[in-house]
Design a protein with these regions (language model features):
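Bacterial N-terminal signal peptides
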Residues: 7-21
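Histidine-rich, glycine-flanked metal-binding segment
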Residues: 26-30, 41, 46-88
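His/Asp/Glu-enriched, well-ordered alpha-helical/loop segment
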Residues: 111, 249, 318, 324-411
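Metal-associated gating/positioning segment near the N- to mid-region
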Residues: 85-157, 173-176, 180-183, 238, ...
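Histidine/acidic residue-rich metal-binding segments in metalloenzymes
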Residues: 148, 199-219, 223-295, 325-344
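Histidine/acidic-residue-rich catalytic or RNA/ligand-binding cores of hydrolases
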Residues: 102-105, 225-227, 264-270, 300-315, ...
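Active-site gating loops and adjacent loop-to-helix segments of metal-dependent hydrolytic enzymes
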Residues: 100-117, 126, 173-188, 223-237, ...
């Protein structure tokens, strides 16, 4: 019966295949054409700002970009006048937790089911997209809530950014990625816990099985977890090599949460694709990152929120105390890493602070060493490269998705203008105007 079913299915598919050319032709003929007149356009590839540009969009993708004076506008196209604004590619945040709520820190989180958290994600996704972030990498969520959210957005059920998802973050028992808030008699162990190289390999396979696009690991302790020091290494080099080897074999990149110098060094030596936080990175770590081409994703805005709102948000007293020690060091080391030649991608750790405020980080990236253009590039072409999506997003280029935003000011002069996004388009559809 199985083979009979397959043969019938094959026959149906063949019949459909014969009709596909006409379907494709009809779809192409009916694709909506939109034309954007841009007063200024940020060319993130060249690092320049172009004046009086016209962008032609057919369906989801960009089909033409060039000077307005010579642009050919298709008959019947929908016109969008942004001639008084600056247009740039949709932004990308490489470190989000869309299913987390900033005001449910510490023990408050124990009252939230994974299902409820996934519903927070629906709200957070919309806020993030409306803020101009058209793609995100979500690096940890319970119950594979981020995977479900990604799929729902892709299927058109909800509005949100393009998502690369990790599922559960993987770490050692008792470490930053474990569940450490409950006492011993409850015997609660986090779903992402894996000790030793072979357990770690198996956990990578599990994450991939259930839909993770990227593998997130905890190489060191953390600020917001109970009972561990941010600078203390947790995974060994051997364990991280096993994780990276398995993940890369399965076509997944690896992001390593690492605050301490030794954990950063071993994560880079193990071959991770990015190091998150990098708070206590030293000269050796910067040199290794530069030589290996490892991206650093440093969240240097949320220190403000933790110190100002952490107690109100329910964060543990020990977490606030740790942040007081590590926050400014991370910002200073951001400058050292950037000037030392390490590749940087924008990542803000949204969910630690309220979603939609992602762009507040730009001001700190500029304060600690970047030009506005370099900060924008970190959130566009650099982030797209780290995602493995350079062919899809990250610049306003022919063939890429029409993920486009606009602001009334000039973000290339002051990237902090990106906190005031006035226009958002994702895949040719206007989300905010």
């Amino acid at each position: 019966m199985k083979f009979k079913h397959l043969s019938v299915t094959a026959a149906v598919l063949c019949a459909l295949g014969a009709a596909l050319p006409s379907f494709a032709a009809d779809a192409k003929a009916e694709a909506k054409v939109v034309v954007i007149r841009a007063g200024k356009l940020v060319d993130v590839v060249a690092g320049t700002v172009l004046k009086d540009q016209t962008i032609v969009i057919t369906g989801e993708r960009i089909t033409s970009v060039g000077p307005s004076a010579s642009a050919k506008v298709p008959a019947g196209a929908q016109m969008i006048d942004l001639s008084s604004q600056t247009v740039l590619p949709g932004l990308i945040d490489m470190h989000t937790h869309l299913t987390s709520d900033a005001y449910l820190g510490g023990y408050n989180a124990l009252g939230v089911s994974d299902t409820r958290a996934a519903l927070y994600g629906v709200r957070s996704a919309r806020k993030t997209l409306e803020a101009g972030f058209t793609s995100v990498r979500n690096v940890g969520a319970g119950g594979f809530g981020d995977v479900a959210l990604r799929d729902a957005i892709n299927e058109g059920d909800f509005i949100g950014p393009r998502m690369s998802t990790a599922g559960y973050a993987i770490g050692i028992q008792g470490g930053h990625c474990d569940e450490n808030l409950l006492p011993a008699d409850k015997n609660v162990v986090g779903r992402g816990v894996a000790d030793g190289p072979w357990e770690a390999r198996a956990k990578v396979r599990e994450m991939a099985k259930y839909g993770a696009d990227v593998i997130k690991i905890c190489a060191s302790g953390g600020v917001l977890s109970k009972g561990n020091e941010p600078g203390a290494q947790q995974y060994t080099l051997e364990e991280m090599q096993a994780i990276v080897g398995e993940a890369h074999k399965l076509g997944r990149k690896v992001a390593a949460h690492a605050h301490g110098a030794s954990s950063i060094r071993d994560a880079i030596l193990a071959g991770v694709d990015s190091v998150e936080h990098s708070s206590l990175i030293d000269e050796e770590g910067i040199k290794l990152a530069r030589e290996k081409g490892t991206y650093l994703v440093m969240d240097i805005y949320n220190d403000d929120f933790i110190l100002q709102e952490g107690e109100k948000a329910g964060m543990l007293p020990e977490s606030i105390a740790k942040e007081k020690v590590i926050g400014q060091l991370q910002r200073d080391n951001f400058r050292k890493a950037f000037t030392g030649g390490a590749k940087m991608a924008f990542g803000s750790d949204s969910g630690v602070y309220p979603h939609g405020d992602n762009a507040k980080q730009f001001a700190y990236m500029i304060k600690y060493g970047m030009t506005s253009m370099q900060a924008i590039q970190a959130a566009t072409i650099n982030a797209a490269d780290l995602l493995g999506w350079k062919d899809r997003v990250g610049s306003i280029s022919v063939g890429k998705f029409a993920d486009i935003i606009a602001v009334k000011g000039d973000p290339a002069e002051n990237a902090a203008e990106l906190t005031k996004v006035s226009f958002v388009m994702k895949g040719g559809e206007v989300i905010r105007r």
